[in-house]
């Protein structure tokens, strides 16, 4: 398979596939006599795993670790679960932070009259000045 075929099968761009090769996530494919990359089913399987890992938020380094585990016949499910648990905890922390940011923005929006006047409590909050009865919070 050439890069355009594997890109279609995996829904990845050729650029992403070359990046994953460059970063060592996939083994370099063999080259045809004309210099084109020739991919195998193992490449497809590895790239699909990488794509799924990326969709759930794994970094390239984390994808590489998951790929190593996936291709290790001696892996334990405990090791795989630990990696997934770490990612879940990271995402949970980020969600909490985003929830606080969302609440802050909701408060600021509610405090702003949104009229033609130049006074804006949102700007005052962003400048760090206290206005009205709103509290300055930093998420």
Curated annotation (Swiss-Prot):
Pfam families, sorted: MerR_1
Keyword vocabulary terms for this entry: Activator, Copper, Cytoplasm, DNA-binding, Metal-binding, Transcription, Transcription regulation
Signal peptide coordinates: none
Every HTH merR-type domain range: 1-69
SUPFAM superfamilies: Putative DNA-binding domain
Keyword Transcription regulation listed: yes
Cellular compartments annotated: Cytoplasm
GO CC annotations, alphabetized: cytoplasm
Binding of Cu(+), residues: 112, 120
Subunit structure: Homodimer.
Domain notes: It contains a N-terminal DNA binding region and a C-terminal metal binding region.
Protein name: HTH-type transcriptional regulator CueR
Gene, per the UniProt record: cueR
């Amino acid at each position: 398979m050439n890069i355009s075929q594997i890109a279609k099968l995996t829904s990845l761009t050729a650029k992403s596939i070359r990046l994953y090769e460059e970063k060592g996530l996939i083994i370099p494919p063999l080259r045809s006599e004309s210099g084109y990359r020739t991919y195998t089913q193992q490449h497809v399987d590895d790239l699909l795993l990488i794509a799924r890992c990326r969709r759930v938020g794994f970094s390239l380094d984390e994808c590489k670790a998951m790929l190593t585990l996936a291709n290790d016949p001696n892996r334990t499910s405990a090791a795989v679960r630990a990696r997934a648990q770490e990612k879940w905890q990271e995402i949970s922390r980020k969600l909490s932070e985003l929830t606080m940011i969302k609440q802050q923005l909701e408060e600021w929006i509610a405090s702003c009259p949104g009229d033609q006047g130049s006074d804006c409590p949102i700007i005052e909050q962003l400048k760090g000045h206290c206005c009205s009865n709103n509290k300055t919070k930093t998420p």
